[in-house]
C-alpha cells in the first residue's frame, strides 16, 4: 500500500486551522505546520501575547516542536507551511534549522523576509538556503489577517467611544 502524498493546499489548510486558534486567543492569526516525510512533526500558532514571549511566533513554535520530535535541531528536508510570509527572526530560525522549504500563503509587505521587504532565505552571506513557495491559499490567508485587524480596530474604536462617554 503506497502512502498518500498531501498537497501544499492540504497542509496550508491545516496551517489556517492553527491560525484560527491564534485568533481565538486574541493573537495575530498566523499558523504554521512543519512536515517531514509527509508527516506532521511540529505545529504552532502565534502566541507572543499569551506567553509573554516575543519569539513565540507560529513558525518558531513549530520548529521547536519539530526539533523535539526529531531529537535534532537540524530539520533537513522538512517543509514549513505558514499562513504569512516569515519575518526576519523566523527566517533566521529556518536557516539555522536547515529546513528545505518554506511554503507561505500571504505576502507581508511590512516585515516579510522571504522576498517582500527583503530575502533573508536566499542571502549570499547565509550558510544555508531555504527554497520558497509562495501564494498557496493567499487570498484566504490574507482575508483572515484583514478580518482580524478590522475587528481589532472596531474594538479599539468602541473602547475609545465608551471611555469618552464616561469622561
From Swiss-Prot:
Record-annotated active site: 59
Protein name: tRNA-specific adenosine deaminase
Record-linked Gene3D superfamilies: Cytidine Deaminase, domain 2 (3.40.140.10)
Annotated EC: 3.5.4.33
Lineage: Bacteria, Pseudomonadati, Pseudomonadota, Gammaproteobacteria, Enterobacterales
PANTHER family, per the entry: CYTOSINE DEAMINASE FAMILY MEMBER, TRNA-SPECIFIC ADENOSINE DEAMINASE
Assembly, per entry: Homodimer.
GO molecular function: protein homodimerization activity; tRNA-specific adenosine-34 deaminase activity; zinc ion binding
Cofactor: Zn(2+)
Cofactor binding description: Binds 1 zinc ion per subunit.
Species name: Escherichia coli (strain K12)
Database matches in Pfam families: MafB19-deam
GO biological process, one term: tRNA wobble adenosine to inosine editing
Family designation: Belongs to the cytidine and deoxycytidylate deaminase family.
Binding-site list for Zn(2+): 57, 87, 90
Gene, per the UniProt record: tadA
InterPro entries in UniProt: APOBEC/CMP_deaminase_Zn-bd, CMP_dCMP_dom, Cytidine_deaminase-like, tRNA_aden_deaminase
Keyword Zinc: yes
Function: Catalyzes the deamination of adenosine to inosine at the wobble position 34 of tRNA(Arg2). Essential for cell viability.
Top-level class of the enzyme under EC nomenclature: hydrolase
Disulfide bonds: none
Catalytic activity, reaction form: adenosine(34) in tRNA + H2O + H(+) = inosine(34) in tRNA + NH4(+)
Highest taxon in the source lineage: Bacteria
Keywords: Hydrolase, Metal-binding, tRNA processing, Zinc
